């Protein structure tokens, strides 16, 4: 199996009690079967506390919150499970976060979640990065290798595009359609950026920011600060962090089109999330981290955005192109 990871992947280290946010609050933690059995069998006060907050739902086990906090989160910011039992006793979710793992059959890609403040700092402070590979890709897959090869090729082109384009958001949206056509079987041809930007000007509507924000206000909202941010946007101009954010989003979602060959809805997801961060304003890294915590870490929210790519009035091509060019 080939394993691919960004060249910065191994630089991440949890900053624990120094973290300005915490992955130990505001969401229930999914607990794998092995650790759920371990926690339920633990003797003493720690076992009693764990059993009090372990709940089963739809075949899965969760460690639920105690007044908005993980019941294992100590006042000093450290984890009671880790300090009393060791890191090996952590459930998979807590052990792995914020590390991502995407299995594409012939190879696996690793990455970092943007919803962690420290990984967000790493991701958005870089001007670019490359993949480090080890092992050999397997030949048998559930998809046509041609499709994955095209997605890998167009993903790199998309990442290069948003790094250099004057208007990276609108350029990426139009490039997504170009890449979709190639994936659908059309003959490969160079992407004409000047012509695409002229097209963007022709297609852009008057721009409806409220319709765009309504899409996100209608999603599940985890925290009150996020609700307030959505109600009080403070748009800012393009910054280098926006290009880094686009590269992160492209790296995370582009290849997922191999499952259904719908690259356009993922391109619109990427553009919409990056555009949202610009419209909300504030510190670019903090806003992106909060966006990821609220949206990317909620599968139902991501599914709603993918479904709404073709139906939501705020996510039409005309509206997105207009807002990305403001």
Q: What residue ranges belong to the model's regions?
A:
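Short, charged/polar micro-motifs that form catalytic or ligand-binding hotspots
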Residues: 14, 84, 144, 148, ...
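Long, low-complexity, compositionally biased intrinsically disordered regions
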Residues: 1-21, 26, 105, 118-120, ...
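Hydrophobic, aromatic-lined core segments that form the binding pocket/scaffold
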Residues: 160-326
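Structured loops at beta-to-helix junctions and adjacent beta-edge loops in soluble globular domains
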Residues: 17, 27, 73, 82, ...
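Internal, well-ordered alpha/beta segment that forms a basic, Gly-enriched binding/recognition surface
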Residues: 77, 85-169
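Active-site-adjacent structural elements in folded domains
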Residues: 9, 142, 261
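Polybasic, low-complexity association/targeting segments
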Residues: 9-59
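Immediate flanking context of iron-sulfur cluster ligation sites
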Residues: 1-19, 53-91, 108
């Amino acid at each position: 199996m080939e394993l691919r990871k960004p060249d910065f992947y191994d630089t991440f280290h949890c900053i624990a009690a120094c973290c300005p946010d915490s992955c130990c609050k505001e969401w229930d933690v999914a607990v794998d079967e092995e650790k759920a059995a371990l926690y339920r069998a633990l003797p003493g006060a720690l076992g009693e506390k764990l059993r009090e907050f372990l709940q089963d739902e739809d075949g899965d086990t969760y460690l639920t919150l105690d007044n908005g906090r993980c019941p294992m989160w100590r006042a000093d910011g450290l984890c009671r499970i880790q300090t009393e039992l060791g890191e090996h006793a952590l459930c998979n979710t807590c052990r792995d976060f914020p590390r991502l793992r995407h299995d594409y059959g012939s190879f696996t890609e690793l990455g970092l979640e943007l919803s962690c403040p420290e990984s967000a700092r790493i991701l958005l402070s870089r001007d670019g990065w490359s993949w480090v590979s080890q092992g050999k890709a397997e030949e048998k897959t559930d998809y046509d290798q041609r499709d994955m090869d095209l997605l890998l090729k167009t993903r790199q082109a998309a990442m290069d595009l948003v790094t250099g384009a004057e208007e990276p958001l609108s350029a990426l949206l139009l490039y997504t359609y170009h890449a979709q056509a190639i994936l659908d079987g059309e003959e490969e041809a160079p992407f004409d950026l000047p012509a695409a930007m002229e097209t963007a000007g022709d297609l852009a509507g008057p721009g409806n920011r409220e319709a765009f924000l309504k899409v996100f206000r209608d999603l599940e909202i985890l925290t009150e600060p996020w609700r307030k941010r959505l109600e009080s946007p403070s748009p800012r101009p393009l910054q280098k962090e926006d290009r880094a954010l686009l590269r992160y989003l492209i790296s995370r979602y582009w290849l997922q089109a191999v499952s259904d060959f719908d690259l356009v809805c993922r391109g619109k997801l990427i553009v919409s999330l990056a555009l949202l961060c610009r419209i909300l304003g504030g510190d670019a890294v903090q806003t992106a981290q909060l966006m990821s915590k609220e949206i990317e870490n909620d599968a139902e929210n991501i599914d709603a955005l993918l479904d709404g790519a073709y139906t939501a009035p705020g996510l039409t091509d005309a509206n997105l192109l207009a807002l990305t060019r403001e």
